[in-house]
Curated annotation (Swiss-Prot):
Chain intervals for the UniProt region annotation (Necessary for interaction with HDAC3 and transcriptional repression): 273-415
Subcellular location, record wording: Nucleus
Compositionally biased tracts (Basic and acidic residues): 118-138, 158-170, 259-270, 277-286
Residues the record lists as Phosphothreonine modifications: T161
Tagged with keyword Coiled coil: no
GO CC annotation terms, alphabetical: cytosol; nucleoplasm; nucleus
Gene Ontology MF terms in the entry: chromatin binding; chromatin DNA binding; RNA binding
Binding partners and assembly: Component of the Notch corepressor complex. Interacts with CIR1 and HDAC3.
One BP annotation, GO: negative regulation of DNA-templated transcription
Main location: nucleus
Native source organism of the sequence: Homo sapiens (Human)
Family: Belongs to the NKAP family.
UniProt protein name: NF-kappa-B-activating protein
C-alpha cells in the first residue's frame, strides 16, 4: 500500500504543474493570464517542496502522511495565489527573495524604499526650500512685484504745501494765455482791415459805374457831392480808427501794469516765505504791540449812535469787560476765560491759534461786546426810559380806541 502513494509525488506533480500552466494559458480569465512568471515559479517551488515531503513519506510508508501532504500542497497553492504581482520597477531576483506574512510584505532584498516614503521626503524638501525662499524675500524684498521704495521721499504736508507750487505755475499760465489772446486779436484786426479794403474797392467800382451812367445828367454837381461825402466818411473813419487804437493801447498798458504788479507781488511773497516760512500771511502786519483791535478810548462817544443792548452778554460779563477796557488790556474770549491777558498774549506769540471759523466768530463777538459796554447806572436809566416810552405808547393806543368807540356809539344814539 505504501508504494502506491509514493509513486504519485514528483513526476505527477511536475506533469500536474505543466497541465495547469497549459490550462492557465488557454483560460480567458484576465487574472490568470495577467499573472507574472513569479507566480509560476512560486508554484514550482511549492511543488518541489511537496515532492520532497512525499519522498520522506515514501520512506516512512504511512498513508496518513500522504493526506497531510495533500493539505499542505493546497495551502501552498492558496498562498501563492494570494501573493500580489510584483511592481514593474522592482527586479526579478528581489521579488523572489521577498518573504510574505499574510497580506503584509517587507522588501528586505532590495535597497529602494516604498514610494510613500519617497513622496514624504520630497514634500519635506520642497517645504524647506519654500521656507528659505520666503525668508530671503522678507529680508531683500521682491522688486518685480512691489517695486523699489522712492530714493527721494515726498515732502511733508506741514513743511511744503501744494499751493506754493501752484502760484508760479498760475502766473506762467496766465502770461501764456494773455500772449495767445493778443495774437488772436491782432489776427482778427488784420482780417477786418482786409474786409474793409475790399468793401471800399467794390464801392468805388460801383460808384464809378454809376458816375459813367449818370455823366449826361448833372455830372458836375453829383461828382462834387460825392467827393464831399467821401471826404466826410474818410474823416469819420480815421477818427474812429484813432479812438480804437488809443483804447487798445490803453488796454494793453493796463494789462502790462497788472502783470508786472502781480509778478512783483508773487516774487515778494516767495522771498518773504523763504525768509520766514512760519509767518502768518492772512493777517496784515500791525505796528502796535497790542494783540487784537484797540478798545474804544472814550465811552461818551456812544451817545451819537443808537445803543445795542448786548443780548449775547452773560450776567456780570459786561462789568468784567469794562474793567479790562479801563486797564487797557485785551478782553478774553469765551474759550480763554480763566487765563490772564498776558498768558493769552504769550500763547499767541508762541503760535497757539484757535481754529479758523471759531476764531472769526469769537473775534466778531468780542468786537461787538467792546462796543456795547455800559455801567449799572446806564442800565437803570435805560430801563426807566424804556418803561416811560412803553406807557406813552399804550396811552396813545387806548385814547385812539376810546375816541373810535365814542364816535360809533354817538352816531347810533343820534339815529
Amino acid at each position: 500500500m505504501a508504494p502506491v502513494s509514493g509513486s504519485r509525488s514528483p513526476d505527477r506533480e511536475a506533469s500536474g504543474s505543466g497541465g495547469r500552466r497549459r490550462s492557465s494559458s488557454k483560460s480567458p480569465k484576465p487574472s490568470k493570464s495577467a499573472r507574472s512568471p513569479r507566480g509560476r515559479r512560486s508554484r514550482s517551488h511549492s511543488c518541489s517542496r511537496s515532492g520532497d515531503r512525499n519522498g520522506l513519506t515514501h520512506q516512512l510508508g504511512g498513508l496518513s502522511q500522504g493526506s497531510r501532504n495533500q493539505s499542505y500542497r493546497s495551502r501552498s497553492r492558496s498562498r501563492s495565489r494570494e501573493r500580489p504581482s510584483a511592481p514593474r520597477g522592482i527586479p526579478f531576483a528581489s521579488a523572489s527573495s521577498s518573504v510574505y506574512y499574510g497580506s503584509y510584505s517587507r522588501p528586505y532584498g532590495s535597497d529602494k524604499p516604498w514610494p510613500s516614503l519617497l513622496d514624504k521626503e520630497r514634500e519635506e524638501s520642497l517645504r524647506q526650500k519654500r521656507l528659505s525662499e520666503r525668508e530671503r524675500i522678507g529680508e531683500l524684498g521682491a522688486p518685480e512685484v512691489w517695486g523699489l521704495s522712492p530714493k527721494n521721499p515726498e515732502p511733508d504736508s506741514d513743511e511744503h504745501t501744494p499751493v506754493e507750487d501752484e502760484e508760479p505755475k498760475k502766473s506762467t499760465t496766465s502770461a501764456s494765455t494773455s500772449e495767445e489772446e493778443k495774437k488772436k486779436k491782432s489776427s482778427r484786426s488784420k482780417e477786418r482791415s482786409k474786409k474793409r479794403r475790399k468793401k471800399k474797392s467794390s464801392k468805388r467800382k460801383h460808384k464809378k459805374y454809376s458816375e459813367d451812367s449818370d455823366s449826361d445828367s448833372d455830372s458836375e454837381t453829383d461828382s462834387s457831392d460825392e467827393d464831399n461825402k467821401r471826404r466826410a466818411k474818410k474823416a469819420k473813419k480815421k477818427e474812429k480808427k484813432k479812438k480804437h487804437r488809443s483804447k487798445k493801447y490803453k488796454k494793453k498798458r493796463s494789462k502790462k501794469s497788472r502783470k508786472e504788479s502781480s509778478d512783483s507781488s508773487s516774487k515778494e511773497s516767495q522771498e518773504e516765505f523763504l525768509e520766514n516760512p512760519w509767518k502768518d500771511r492772512t493777517k496784515a502786519e500791525e505796528p502796535s504791540d497790542l494783540i487784537g483791535p484797540e478798545a474804544p478810548k472814550t465811552l461818551t462817544s456812544q451817545d451819537d449812535k443808537p445803543l445795542n443792548y448786548g443780548h449775547a452778554l452773560l450776567p456780570g460779563e459786561g462789568a468784567a469787560m469794562a474793567e479790562y477796557v479801563k486797564a487797557g488790556k485785551r478782553i478774553p474770549r469765551r474759550g480763554e476765560i480763566g487765563l490772564t491777558s498776558e498768558e493769552i498774549a504769550s500763547f499767541e506769540c508762541s503760535g497757539y491759534v484757535m481754529s479758523g471759523s471759531r476764531h472769526r466768530r469769537m473775534e466778531a463777538v468780542r468786537l461787538r461786546k467792546e462796543n456795547q459796554i455800559y455801567s449799572a447806572d446806564e442800565k437803570r436809566a435805560l430801563a426807566s426810559f424804556n418803561q416811560e416810552e412803553r406807557r406813552k405808547r399804550e396811552n396813545k393806543i387806548l385814547a385812539s380806541f376810546r375816541e373810535m368807540v365814542y364816535r360809533k356809539t354817538k352816531g347810533k344814539d343820534d339815529k
